[in-house]
From Swiss-Prot:
GO molecular function, one term: DNA clamp loader activity
Organism listed in the record: Homo sapiens
InterPro entries named among the record's database cross-references: AAA+_ATPase, DNA_pol3_clamp-load_cplx_C, DNA_Rep/Repair_Clamp_Loader, P-loop_NTPase
A family per Pfam: RFC_C
Localisation per UniProt entry: Nucleus
Predominant localisation class: nucleus
The protein's assembly and partners: Subunit of the RFC complex, an heteropentameric complex consisting of a large subunit RFC1 and four small subunits RFC2, RFC3, RFC4 and RFC5; the RFC complex interacts with PCNA. Forms an heterotetrameric complex with RFC2, RFC4 and RFC5; this complex has ATPase activity but is not stimulated by PCNA. The heterotetramer of subunits RFC2, RFC3, RFC4 and RFC5 interacts with RAD17. Interacts with CNTD1; this interaction facilitates crossover formation.
Record-linked SMART domains: AAA
Nucleus as UniProt keyword: yes
Record gene name: RFC3
Record GO biological process: DNA repair; DNA replication; DNA strand elongation involved in DNA replication; DNA synthesis involved in DNA repair; DNA-templated DNA replication; positive regulation of DNA-directed DNA polymerase activity
Location of N6-acetyllysine modifications: K20
UniProt record similarity statement: Belongs to the activator 1 small subunits family.
GO cellular component, as recorded: Ctf18 RFC-like complex; DNA replication factor C complex; nucleoplasm; nucleus
Record protein name field: Replication factor C subunit 3
Length: 356
């Protein structure tokens, strides 16, 4: 039994439910013969990976769906061994180099070199190149990005790159200039409602339009999240009702409780408790950027107009530090400590003003 997001994922460009003009342009790009490097970017849950797999299907046929998971060990110049997991077919290789941390440069160089120098096992694909799909390119170190730029030029004849990321702002200009940029915007509320209704019909379920609209809005235009929430609603209660409760993920509830704990008390003991809660989120693989964004959103509900600006500016500062550093907990805890000091001073000043 598979999740709806996997079970009903379109496998060809002609079956995509939205951005159909873009799908037609991508099909023309594949058929023209001169396939370039691609930089596919857009918000989470917009359908980037689905479109990339559809492009690969258009390039090579059904063979790209015969996937295998491979584990490779790469040795760095300092003799350190790095284990990397990849997903591969006979025609392409998918890897997330940022999993290797500061050694991502070595991973990129070795992976691309291996793929570019190996021959395809099936020769009837009529393509003289393989494709390497690199995910989360915006999380690569600058060294790795410069190495990627050099490698792109070196192996252009036997290898094409498809780079996938949420934002191009952290991708260096030399890479952006060597790729055809493909922006995948988030689907509209109407698009998500249509997809939810279609999936529920295929499952033999009756989804009220009001519930579909609420799911689409609560997902923040993230189609993957909307489908997962819809499936959770199905498990929780069926037949659906227009006003039924939409279940939240555990980490979102936990993050809200953490924000409430910060606002309710500003002491060293409470800061220690919050640090433990932040560790709990990080160990469950919640990205630190998401934690920072969620904390800010919840904390702003407890701030007035003047304080909101200061807190948002402070969050931007520590989020920037978070990107530069390697220990997320330091910057998250520093943000919480700074907020506690600011909020406590604000409340004390407010009380003094009321007394006089």
């Amino acid at each position: 039994m598979s999740l709806w997001v996997d079970k009903y994922r379109p496998c060809s460009l002609g079956r995509l439910d939205y951005h159909k003009e873009q799908a037609a342009q991508l099909r023309n790009l594949v058929q023209c013969g001169d396939f370039p490097h691609l930089l596919v970017y857009g918000p989470s849950g917009a359908g980037k990976k689905t479109r990339i797999m559809c492009i690969l299907r258009e390039l090579y046929g059904v063979g790209v769906e015969k996937l295998r998971i491979e584990h490779q060990t790469i040795t760095t110049p300092s003799k350190k061994k790095i284990e990397i997991s990849t997903i591969a077919s006979n025609y392409h290789l998918e890897v997330n180099p940022s999993d290797a941390g500061n050694s991502d440069r070595v991973v990129i160089q070795e992976m691309l070199k291996t793929v570019a120098q190996s021959q395809q096992l099936e020769t009837n694909s009529q393509r003289d190149f393989k494709v390497v799909l690199l995910t989360e390119v915006d999380k690569l170190t600058k060294d790795a990005q410069h190495a990627l730029r050099r490698t792109m030029e070196k192996y252009m004849s036997t290898c094409r790159l498809i780079l996938c990321c949420n934002s191009t702002s952290k991708v260096i200009p030399p890479i952006r200039s060597r790729c055809l940029a493909v922006r995948v915007p988030a689907p509209s509320i109407e698009d998500i409602c249509h997809v939810l209704s279609t999936v529920c019909k295929k499952e033999g379920l009756n989804l009220p339009s009001q519930l579909a609209h609420r799911l689409a809005e609560k997902s923040c235009r993230n189609l993957r999240k909307a489908l997962l929430m819809c499936e959770a609603c199905r498990v929780q209660q069926y037949p659906f009702t227009a006003d039924q409760e939409i279940p939240e993920t555990d980490w979102e509830v936990y993050l809200r409780e953490t924000a409430n704990a910060i606002v309710s008390q500003q002491t060293p003991q409470r800061l220690l408790e919050v640090r433990g809660r932040l560790y709990e989120l990080l160990t469950h693989c919640i990205p630190p950027e998401i934690i920072m964004k969620g904390l800010l959103s919840e904390l702003l509900h407890n701030c007035d107009g003047q304080l909101k600006g200061e807190v948002a500016q402070m969050a931007a500062y520590y989020e920037h530090r978070l990107q530069l550093g390697s220990k997320a907990i330091y910057h998250l805890e520093a943000f919480v400590a700074k907020f506690m000091a600011l909020y406590k001073k604000f409340m004390e000043d407010g009380l003094e003003g009321m007394m006089f």
